[in-house]
């Protein structure tokens, strides 16, 4: 009688074991990473959900929407508690915007000008007048001249956008005094009195106007030069060690760039600007005050915690990027023109280092105004007299710096749209001088630009191509594969690299080393080169061969020495070949291992 249970168990196992084996196999497949079936199931489930959604009744759809609204309301209440006086709502649930990329060609507009009344008929009339100017239609010019003289600045700017290549306007949101140009609903903005001088009465109406004229709006936020905030919340200003608030030569107090309270203030204003319709946030004065040597000994920056100034700016931009990510907006930063040449914030000491800032932004906007360069820059006695030359030289430096980054931002320079009559030997900046700056960028593949004129007076003829632009071919479209974006051949890059090594200009070596062949941190890179204890005695670059668009070889000879105690090791190579690759459009040197072997005693 006891045999039957055993028989039943055996029969059961015969049925169950295959199922167990199949289950184990499925588990093993999952463990081994074979998740295609699971992904397929998920996709099927998602498709099923979509099908079900389509099959939902109107009542069910309404219930689902009400649920989303309730969840969002709860989230916003939570955010209000967390953000407090810095609270700004998220994008509306029904806002399905995507980040818009535009090849921007833009003009700067103050809050005063952007707040001027607009008659669309006047805008169209000015556009017609511009066309007549361009075509040299004297009868139409004479017909409209007396009328257009009566138009306000903003109507003329909009007319320029209608009639020329201008498609972007940079509008002050928080101005150079720290005041809002339109009324903000952010609690902290009201508390510090930043709403006291509102000039744009209808920000939504302004955005509708931009949409109508297909204008890309950029919100300029003057970040750390904010005398209003610094004066009203002195505990968040740059402090004097002796007590009280530090002020610059013009008596202006600055906020402390290390202070996260200040970060939250500027980021909140940026968020609200997005909600109002701006498609890009441009942080200006994203730096410490200049003349650092004068104020460094007497000032204190609470919250510094041993960080360099450029770390504070780097950290702020990364924080802003994270906070603005869900707002679907581009981020730009304005930097001094000299940042294209200086390294690690030296000697300026204002917190601006190209590679550190570039990691967290979409657009880098160096302010390359020829009038702002002193005698000797780029070999010019009066740089202001050379709009093309200054732009070309500075942008080549910018391109080289950008190429050292894994995900570089777009370079979009600010150019000079004004006459710098205070400069000794200045020239008048007419349309040709403005256009020569644009030409310099085009020749280097940089088609974007922003024009600065503090008075907002722009000559429309500056925004039509000149004859020299007709034959410009962008570097990446040229047939000459030997040259990189800034016109260098492999042998010239090799000479630059070895000259930098010989003279211990490690920053240049950093820029000309492929990204995967070095660390990102420059100090670590420099230490790694110095630790080799190699001295380049001499070199001679003989010839080069371009293998394809992105690879080349250079033949060279060189001599290195290495001092170890009382011995000198040398390596002499009369016929070596080094490889170069083109990365982000720039030729870079793949450095081989150099191992000195020959020993010379007692040298």
Residue positions per predicted region:
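Aromatic-lined carbohydrate-recognition surfaces of secreted/lumenal glycan-active proteins
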Residues: 216-226, 282, 309-350, 406-418
């Amino acid at each position: 009688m006891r045999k039957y249970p055993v028989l039943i168990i055996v029969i059961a196992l015969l049925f169950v074991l295959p199922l167990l084996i199949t289950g184990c196999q499925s588990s093993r497949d999952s463990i081994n990473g074979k998740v295609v079936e699971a992904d397929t199931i998920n996709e099927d489930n998602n498709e099923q959900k979509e099908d079900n959604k389509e099959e939902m009744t109107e009542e069910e759809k309404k219930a689902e929407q009400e649920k989303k609204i309730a969840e969002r309301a709860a989230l916003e209440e939570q955010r209000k508690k967390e953000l407090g006086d810095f609270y700004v709502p998220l994008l509306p649930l029904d806002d399905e915007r995507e980040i818009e990329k535009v090849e921007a060609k833009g003009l700067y507009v103050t809050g005063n000008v952007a707040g001027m009344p607009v008659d669309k008929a006047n805008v169209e009339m000015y556009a017609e007048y511009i066309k007549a100017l361009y075509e040299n239609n004297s009868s139409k010019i004479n017909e409209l001249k007396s009328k257009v003289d009566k138009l306000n600045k903003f109507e003329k700017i909009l007319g320029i956008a209608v009639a020329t290549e201008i498609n972007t306007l940079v509008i002050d949101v928080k101005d150079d005094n720290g005041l809002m140009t339109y009324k903000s609903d952010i609690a902290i903005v009201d508390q510090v009195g930043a709403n006291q001088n509102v000039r744009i009465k209808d920000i939504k109406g302004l955005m509708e106007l931009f949409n109508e004229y297909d204008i890309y709006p950029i919100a300029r936020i003057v970040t750390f030069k904010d005398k209003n905030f610094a004066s009203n919340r002195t505990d968040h200003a740059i402090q004097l060690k002796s007590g009280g608030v530090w002020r610059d030569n013009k008596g202006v107090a600055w906020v402390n760039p290390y202070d996260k309270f200040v970060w939250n203030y500027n980021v909140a204003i940026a968020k609200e600007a997005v909600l109002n319709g701006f498609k890009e946030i441009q942080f200006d004065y994203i730096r410490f005050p200049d003349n650092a040597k004068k104020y460094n000994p007497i000032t204190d920056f609470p919250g510094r915690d041993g960080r360099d100034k450029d770390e504070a700016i780097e950290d702020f931009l990364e924080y802003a990027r994270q906070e603005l990510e869900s707002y679907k907006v581009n981020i730009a930063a304005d930097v001094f023109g000299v940042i294209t040449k200086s390294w690690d914030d030296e000697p300026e000491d204002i917190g601006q280092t190209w590679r550190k800032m570039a990691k967290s932004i979409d657009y880098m906007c160096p302010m390359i105004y020829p009038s702002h360069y002193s005698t000797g820059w780029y070999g010019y006695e009066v740089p202001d007299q050379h709009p093309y030359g200054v732009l070309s030289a500075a942008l080549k430096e910018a391109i080289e710096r950008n190429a050292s980054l894994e995900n570089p931002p777009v370079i979009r320079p600010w150019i000079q749209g004004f006459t710098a009559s205070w400069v000794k030997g200045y020239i008048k900046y007419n349309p040709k001088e403005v256009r020569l700056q644009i030409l310099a960028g085009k020749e280097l593949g940089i088609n974007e630009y922003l024009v600065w004129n503090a008075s907002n007076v722009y000559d429309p003829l500056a925004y039509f191509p000149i004859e020299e632009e007709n034959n410009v071919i962008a570097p990446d479209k040229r047939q000459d594969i030997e040259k990189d974006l800034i016109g260098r051949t492999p042998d010239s890059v090799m000479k630059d690299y070895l000259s930098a090594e010989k003279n211990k200009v490690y920053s240049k070596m950093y820029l000309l080393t492929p990204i995967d062949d070095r660390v990102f941190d420059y100090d670590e890179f420099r230490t790694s080169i110095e630790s080799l204890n190699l001295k380049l005695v001499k070199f001679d670059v003989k010839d080069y061969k371009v293998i394809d668009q992105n690879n080349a070889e250079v033949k060279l000879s060189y001599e290195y020495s290495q001092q170890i105690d009382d011995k000198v090791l040398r390596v002499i190579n009369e016929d070596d070949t080094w490889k170069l690759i083109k990365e982000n459009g720039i030729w870079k040197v793949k450095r081989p291992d150099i191992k000195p072997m020959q020993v010379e005693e007692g040298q």
